[in-house]
Amino acid sequence: MKIAFFSDCYLDLTGGIVSSINAQKTALENLGHEVYIFSTGFPRKKETLAKMSVNNIYQVPSCKLFFRGLTPVSRRPKIIEKWLSKNHPELKDFDVFYIHYEGGCSIAGLRLANKYKIPSVQVMHGREDMGETHIIPFGFRTIVAAALNWFHSWYLPHKVKVPRDDYLADNLAKAKMWTLMVNHANFADLVLTPSEHFRQKLIHYGVKKPIKVFPNGYPDDQFPENPTPKELEPGKELRIIWHSRVSAEKRMMPFLHALEKVRGKFRFDVYGGGGDHFRARRYAKHRHLNAHFHGNVSFDKIQKAIATSHLDVLVSYNFDTFGMTLIEAEAAGIPVFFCDPDMEEIVPKGSFIISANENPITMAESLNYLLAHPENIRKMSEVMLSHRDEVRISRRIETLIKIFNDIIKK
């Protein structure tokens, strides 16, 4: 099978989308399938682009001076389509176009699939309504959301208009972003989501195409070898790890506020970058928190850090649809801490601590309870270890292949 991935969130980035694409590419290639990846990226030398092409990874035309935060931005979809048609005419003979975002590169992939009559599978990874709300300053959110919505509608039809409501689209900016997400999904032949709760939200707002749940998996070649149950001795330091974006939507600042109220010893290690990185580091230093910010590092280093931790944290609320952080913790047998009840779907029962709400005071109470009952670390760790093989990508990739085969036969 020949499969072409298209994503605006792959090159030059870290996070769940990147991890899932890498894991799936490797697993598919190990089974003999041919996989291309097309992605937006920062400027590169021709020599670097040539080296990437050896692994069938290609950078599409991208803006040289215009970036969205720390994220590269593609050029207009029609420019990318022309580039793809000229430089990769072999795409006409591919079996599936597999789309992993809603930006310019992803739009181009959907449009080309439609032009070439190739089945398209769109993965809806995340809540763009919440991402836009957290990233864009107050006062500009509606303007930016309207502009993105308008730009998107130039290339893909917007047959569904999501109105404001009392559920998830409680302001005009969010309604605009839901309009974008729903119409993007409806242009594909099939939609995948990493979780059932996100599937239900997409259906609620008007996605009419078939939606299947396909959770992300952990790469087999990087799977931790023989981890043992974690233990926290009474009075000893609780080692907490964060390995996701340091950004407003991930709620780093509220978690630092919670740590200020923790009674007991802890060490907080942060791996990853983002819009709140420098602010968080300054705050932790000013408040004399035992927090260490390591920035973006290789996944090998993150794995080693996870292995020496007691507790993994993901404290976003009403934002994450899956949380690759949780899967990476499960593979290593590390208990997890979160605030969003939707995340209970992702990890096994008995392996996590969930805060009663997203408030820093409540989060601190949960952490203080854990420090007062350190024996719970081992109990949760043992649950994680008993389920960890379930998250291997090799256990899940056959499901994806069946999804592809079914859509090809239609």
Where do the PLM segments sit?
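A charged, aromatic-enriched C-terminal amphipathic alpha-helix characteristic of glycosyltransferases
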Residues: 374-408
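Conserved acidic donor-binding segment of nucleotide-sugar-dependent glycosyltransferases
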Residues: 351-361, 369-374
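Acidic donor-binding loop of glycosyltransferase active sites
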Residues: 95, 189, 307-321
